[in-house]
């Protein structure tokens, strides 16, 4: 499966400055057998230009060296929080991360994804100026040539705002709801009791956002 490198539509967003009174973003990272890509993922998160973050890594009983990698990063950067649990699947791991999140905005990054350095700054800017309950942004495959045909037209949705859920959001905007390309208002997630469906390990984010969008 190709690695996904999450990006924002605004290429000059990396010029944004960190605001002293900025809103905290909670980034939830489920970890299982992730030793190959985990360091690159965490490097991309701690290197964000928006520094007011908490990076919640949920080690879902990973049998490889992921735990030691997480321990090293937590010792290096206090924003990295590690939660250990027995293996229960990616949905439960994300729910665990959401339950421990203290930020105003929730983001989901898989342990083989990376963010461009201004991704969180751009997400923060959109939430500050437009106050959405759910935000979908662009992504790209790394390397680009390995992107499956089914994914190519969904990589960069246009800049659009929906005041209420509409089927066009999914079927005309091609804003397919992969977890790694979406941010949520934490207040909205708590109010609507948004969770991933335990037991689902395939297309779990698709089911999750079919529950999210109608309430946003």
Task: Describe each model-derived feature in a short phrase.
Residues 7-10:
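Cysteine-centered motifs
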Residues 17-216:
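Nucleotide-sugar donor-binding/catalytic module of glycosyltransferases
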């Amino acid at each position: 499966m190709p690695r996904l490198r999450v990006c924002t539509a605004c290429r000059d967003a990396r010029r944004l400055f960190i605001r002293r009174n900025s809103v905290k973003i909670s980034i939830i990272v489920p970890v299982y057998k992730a030793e190959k890509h985990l360091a690159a993922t965490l490097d991309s998160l701690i290197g964000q230009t928006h520094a007011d973050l908490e990076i919640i890594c949920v080690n879902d009983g990973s049998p490889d060296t992921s735990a030691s990698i997480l321990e090293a990063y937590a010792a290096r950067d206090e924003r990295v929080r590690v939660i250990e649990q027995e293996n229960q699947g990616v949905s439960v791991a994300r729910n665990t991360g959401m339950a421990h999140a203290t930020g105003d905005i929730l983001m989901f990054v898989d342990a083989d994804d990376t963010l461009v350095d201004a991704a969180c700054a751009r997400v923060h800017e959109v939430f500050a100026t437009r106050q959405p309950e759910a935000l979908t942004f662009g992504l790209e495959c790394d390397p680009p040539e390995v992107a499956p045909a089914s994914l190519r037209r969904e990589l960069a949705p246009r800049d659009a705002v929906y005041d209420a859920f509409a089927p066009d959001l999914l079927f005309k905007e091609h804003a397919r709801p992969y977890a790694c390309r979406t941010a949520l208002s934490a207040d909205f997630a708590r109010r609507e009791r948004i969770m991933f469906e335990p037991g689902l390990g395939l297309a779990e984010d698709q089911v999750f956002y079919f529950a999210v969008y109608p309430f946003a």
